[in-house]
Amino acid sequence: NLYEGFMDYLSARVLGIGNGEDHLVLNSVSNLTKAYRHLDGYGKLQCHFDNDEAGRRTLETLRARYGGKVADCSGLYGGCKDLNDYLQKTLAERQAWRENEKKGKNNGIKL
């Protein structure tokens, strides 16, 4: 599992992504070439990059080097900037649901 930043890594851990697997945090996509020596031995690279131009460029750079070993995991948090944004949105939605449940506004539906 490969992340652009440490907050995305921490968010992945909270969400249960990659339990029992190795993780590598770039801290900036500009550090990608420094990470190659750590990535070369892996059979699959699950990339959790930001949904922006820099994230897409980094993904394409990895695909050029590693081909089919590279998996784009950004679909998990589509509509959000990154994993941390997705986690914050998910937590806010759960909190709103719980508050509505207390007020009886969820029509008896439970999470």
Annotated model-derived regions:
Residues 1-4, 47:
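Conserved Lys-Pro-Asp/Glu-containing loop-to-beta segment of HAD-superfamily phosphomonoesterases
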